[in-house]
């Protein structure tokens, strides 16, 4: 389960989101306005393309997050798990209803089930 402290950090900051393509090539993007629901991270997809394509071949993903004041005291975590992309249903409806997404055309919800959390050392 994702702790309350990590949940706050995740929901208040941009995250790096890494996927792996068909030929094993890594791809990393920044995502924001994500939500933590239990042991899952829910990402709203308004513009994500290559990462979605990569998930068709490999569902293993990694996210990284750190605090905004990292230059004073760096606190960060890597969150690894498996991702699924939803273009309809409960998770799609959930992200479409989020106030942060008002005015955006949401294409899908990416739901990452977190299997491992690692504290990053600075």
Report residues per predicted region:
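Binding-site signature for planar aromatic cofactors or substrates
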Residues: 1-122
């Amino acid at each position: 389960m994702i702790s309350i402290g990590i949940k706050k950090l995740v929901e208040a900051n941009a995250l790096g989101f890494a996927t792996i393509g068909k030929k094993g090539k890594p791809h990393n993007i920044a995502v924001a306005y994500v939500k933590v629901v239990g042991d899952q991270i829910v990402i709203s997809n308004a513009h994500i393309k290559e990462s979605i394509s990569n998930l068709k071949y490999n569902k293993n993903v990694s996210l990284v997050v750190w605090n905004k004041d990292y230059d004073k005291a760096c606190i960060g975590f890597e969150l690894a798990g498996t991702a699924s992309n939803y273009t309809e249903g409960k998770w799609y409806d959930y992200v479409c209803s989020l106030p942060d997404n008002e005015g955006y055309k949401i294409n899908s919800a990416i739901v990452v089930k977190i299997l491992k959390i690692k504290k990053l050392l600075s």
